Amino acid sequence: MTTPSYAAIDAPLQAPSATLDAAARSLSAATIAPHPLQLSGLHKRYGAHEVLRGVSLTARKGDVLSIIGSSGSGKSTLLRCINLLEHPTEGEIRVGGEPLRLRRDARGDLECADRKQLQRVRSRLAMVFQNFNLWSHMTVLENIVEAPIHVLGMRKAAAIKAAEAYLQKVGLYERRHYHPAHLSGGQQQRAAIARALAVEPEVLLFDEPTSALDPELVGEVLRVMQSLAQEGRTMIVVTHEMGFARCVSNHAIFLHRGLVEEEGDPAQVLSEPRSERLRQFISGSLK
């Protein structure tokens, strides 16, 4: 019979009531802490074409959610609806427990009813795009300090110091004064990740961050993303990289025709798919 180990045997005794109170406070804090992101019943229509047909998901703190699916399944549209780059037609979005206040626009889509709230909520989210979206007329460093200075109101010296730290993290400090045109695709995407980190978001959104890269450059970007996951950052990643989805994410979501067709533990979802459509998708991605 194994003898249990009591690491705190020499610790001072605490009154049972105090112990219970501390445990209750800890449980209460864990219970009421809002999730970084929650979507409920999200729809998006373009005329008669419905791209999203009621998507719901929850990202808990430290989650890495990989969203997989064929082209046209609604993956990128979903990310763009989260931060209102696209206006959803129906549904609810909560960021840090705060529901976005939405109203109907002239086309019948939902738009933010409170611009100050939109700016505040967007500061909790940061998106890394397929094609980097760096300003070509600015250096890497200038790209990264732009939002902290002009959106968050940081002092320039503090923004530069933080930006340089993030560039160290992604391995680009030595190229901080380069313009994007003088960087490889992988370097540009790493700069884009540093730019996203600079606003200290609660959730990082990645829209197929390796799809525009040459195959030999994919690994350097995935390694940076893996290090962010190991730091406990909350990430939602639209990806075709099945290895990343399996090994780095803790939850996989298969989107098909605007619906969550299957989700769960990545190893199980990818190794033992229940739906025929997911089996076909995985088979095709391995060719």
Language model features: what each stretch is:
Residues Y178, V199, E231:
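Conserved signature/switch motifs of ABC ATPase nucleotide-binding domains
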Residues L204-D207:
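Catalytic Walker B motif of ABC-type/P-loop ATPase nucleotide-binding domains
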Residues H179-L183, Q187:
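Conserved ABC ATPase signature
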Residues I68-S70:
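The feature captures the beta-strand-to-loop junction immediately N-terminal to the Walker
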Residues E263-G264:
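ABC ATPase "signature
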